[in-house]
Amino acid sequence: MKTFVFIVLVALAFVLTAAKEERANPSELVSALAELVMLDAERGVDKPGCRYLFGGCKSDDDCCPRLGCKGKGHDYCAWDGTFSD
């Protein structure tokens, strides 16, 4: 119980600190979020028509990035074991 209360207090302190920093300079937050969206677009995370985790597939090309077609008989998209940079 003591550990749970400690974790809640640390999380609350983190949220309050982050909110205070956001109010101090919201343009930095907006630019950071825009950069993340651009990086996802460059990596092809939002590739149209790709199959997500556990989606049906016929080949690795059917799956979204970082996923590969696995299984025998009932093929599905699963993590291919790679990490992003």
Swiss-Prot record:
Q: According to its UniProt record, where is this protein located?
A: Secreted
Highest taxon in the source lineage: Eukaryota
* Tissues in which the UniProt entry reports expression: Expressed by the venom gland.
The molecular function terms in GO held by this entry are: ion channel inhibitor activity; potassium channel regulator activity; sodium channel regulator activity; toxin activity
Domain-related comment: The presence of a 'disulfide through disulfide knot' structurally defines this protein as a knottin.
Question: Which family does the entry's similarity section mention?
Answer: Belongs to the neurotoxin 10 (Hwtx-1) family.
What name appears for this protein in its UniProt entry?
Delta/kappa-theraphotoxin-Pm1a
Query: What organism is this sequence from?
Result: Pelinobius muticus
